[in-house]
Amino acid sequence: MTQFNIPVTMSSSLSIILVILVSLSTAHSELCNPQDKQALLQIKKDLGNPTTLSSWLPTTDCCNRTWLGVLCDTDTQTYRVNNLDLSGLNLPKPYPIPSSLANLPYLNFLYIGGINNLVGPIPPAIAKLTQLHYLYITHTNVSGAIPDFLSQIKTLVTLDFSYNALSGTLPPSISSLPNLVGITFDGNRISGAIPDSYGSFSKLFTSMTISRNRLTGKIPPTFANLNLAFVDLSRNMLEGDASVLFGSDKNTQKIHLAKNSLAFDLGKVGLSKNLNGLDLRNNRIYGTLPQGLTQLKFLHSLNVSFNNLCGEIPQGGNLQRFDVSAYANNKCLCGSPLPACT
């Protein structure tokens, strides 16, 4: 058999060519858009290169599911970064929300949460994310007011800014967002009155939770136009009439208004047949308990304690299944499970 001896110099040249070809093949096969990768690496830098993002490496593909919290659009096969989860980052010192987020124009979902060292206001750069549907900034020390510029992101479906250090007043302009389904602003320092415009959210809007803030004034009469499945305005300083939140023609499932100074005749409100949770404790609500409560077969949570209610607790439904504490400390409420009326 004839043998061929390849010179050493030729063998070395072939090895170099092979390495180059493999490198070119790898580069060509990378799905991550180079602009998206550059933006992500800048975000990492702007946050002080936290060790939690150690998987974000310039030599790897950001769309191969090895980059923590990063997902790309595989449905349309554009492979643009459309989902970013920045939760639980161990930032080495306080940092603001990076304005470089604006360089991810295809983001549909942005979650920023559980970061004690995240501080400062919500940056105007967020308004450039014109395809954003879901925006979560929660359990951080982000401060300042909820910005008006959010009304520019017409695609927004969900806004969750719960448990931060946000202050100022509620921005009236977000009620113009045509696709907004719900807002969650619990656990901040938001003050002032609820804007009248919040009664003009679109028919898609079904959830409003703004508990544990410093809201004052009255619930706008325009809320009669809303059909909320979930409403939680508890632990504020609201006063006056909250009957506009009730109605037999609504699809309301939960109403939580505890620990305010609300005063209205509970006996005159209509009740949604879907109501499963009602927390009205620690207010100034008067009148009687509506007979309609006995017809609510889904009602599993009720607390009307520490109000000015009177009369006999209606018999039937689930009302006698609740503990005495659910009815305690009213003006003259009586009947099972409280002592009998005299």
Curated annotation (Swiss-Prot):
Leader peptide range in chain numbering: 1-29
BP-aspect Gene Ontology terms: defense response
Any GO CC annotation of this UniProt entry: membrane
Membrane-topology descriptor: Peripheral membrane protein
Name of one Pfam family that matches: LRR_1
Subcellular location: Secreted, Cell wall; Membrane
Highest taxon, organism lineage: Eukaryota
UniProt keyword terms in alphabetical order: Cell wall, Disulfide bond, Glycoprotein, Leucine-rich repeat, Membrane, Plant defense, Repeat, Secreted, Signal
Gene3D superfamilies to which the protein is assigned, alphabetical: Ribonuclease Inhibitor
LRR repeats: 82-107, 108-132, 133-156, 157-180, 181-205, 206-228, 229-252, 253-275, 276-299, 300-319
Glycosylation sites: N64, N141, N303
Post-translational modification: Asn-303 is not glycosylated.
Disulfide cross-links: C32-C62, C63-C72, C310-C332, C334-C341
Similarity annotation: Belongs to the polygalacturonase-inhibiting protein family.
Function, in words: Inhibitor of fungal polygalacturonase. It is an important factor for plant resistance to phytopathogenic fungi. Inhibits all polygalacturonases (PG) tested, with the exception of PG from F.oxysporum which was only inhibited at 60%.
Name of protein: Polygalacturonase inhibitor 2
Native source organism of the sequence: Phaseolus vulgaris (Kidney bean)
